[in-house]
Amino acid sequence: MTYEPDTADVAEELLHNLRGRLGTDSVDYAEPPERIHGGFDNFIYAFSLSAAPLRFSGRLILRLYRPDTDPRQACFESAIQNVLAGAGYPSPPVLLVGRSGDGLGLPFVVMPMVPGRLMLDTMWGPTAIRMAVTLAKTQIDLHAIDPEPVRRALARAGCPSHVLAVERDLWEMEREIERAGLVGLRPGARWLGDNRPPPVEDTVVCHGDFHPLNVLVDEGRVSGVIDWSARRVRLGDPAYDVGATAAILAHGPVDVPDLLAGPINLGRRCFVALYRRAYLRDRPLDRDRIRYYEALRSLVFLVEAGAARQAAAGVIPPIFKRTAFGDERTVRGVVQRFHAITGETPRIPDAGRGA
């Protein structure tokens, strides 16, 4: 099941909201909202205004959250992005926050458009080597930021501390396995529960979804890190962030013919190795902890794919958010990697058939 808002309706309601919030009816569109690529958890529109205050000059982005998104996400994103931007990190500041009752029917944020291109679009040939190092360095810079101002800002935004714990992934995954009847994933979840690493004192800000689709590059330099999701941001072990990134880099969807799958996967493995080496060279971490968190995120992928198949089969209610990990080739790769780390072989329902 998918939900798609009407762009004309979004434009009308957004302008009405902006005029009310900015206190003037003279504000109008220089460029009306246009849907742009990206966003698994939200709908993204680019637009610009005329006769608006200076901070609303230039091209702007509207992120309109999907109906099943945590209603606190807009406030969460505003809090963390503004703190990080204030600390000098390339996170776009949020200019305006809207709740579901503010006219558009769904929570939203407005922020400046980040210049540049997605890092993924620049990763060809020798540039890929440089981008692997750049990705690692940008993540290291994030992990060097004092997490306490972030914790305080998120607490003011209504985000309790347990929501930011890295253990939350395991709790939510176990609950979703039972809700969706994914019995073939129970042994893997049990292994993760039995082999949790001990707590660390080195608490950092973890993006949780740090990969080349969430990093923008302008003239070879990082211009923005986006998509600070309440589902994924954590304050905890830096190995959590590195392991999650390794899993995403290895298994994120790439739509290529079967003939090219082998060479593409080889290139991905090389990129992951370069990224991991660059990170550990400048900020050493326990490799076993990284592998554990890579396995954790890998099982999260399988839970997401399995739940999508159960929903498609009518076993559980429809899911608004599409999965990026549901095709057979991706599932096979994730299962193989999880087995290599844990010795367990998780299983999800076949596509087109419920459990």
Explain the meaning of each model-derived region.
Residues 1-29:
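Juxta-kinase regulatory segment immediately upstream of eukaryotic protein kinase catalytic domains
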Residues 32-165, 172-187, 196-202:
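ATP-binding pocket architecture of kinase catalytic cores
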Residues 205-207, 212:
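Catalytic-loop of the protein kinase fold
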Residues 222:
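Conserved active-site segments centered on acidic
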Residues 226-231:
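Activation of the activation-loop gatekeeper triad in protein kinase-fold domains
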Residues 240-283, 297-315:
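Active-site activation/catalytic loop segments of kinase-like enzymes and analogous catalytic loops
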Residues 285-289, 300-355:
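Helical subdomain adjoining the active site within ATP-dependent kinase catalytic cores
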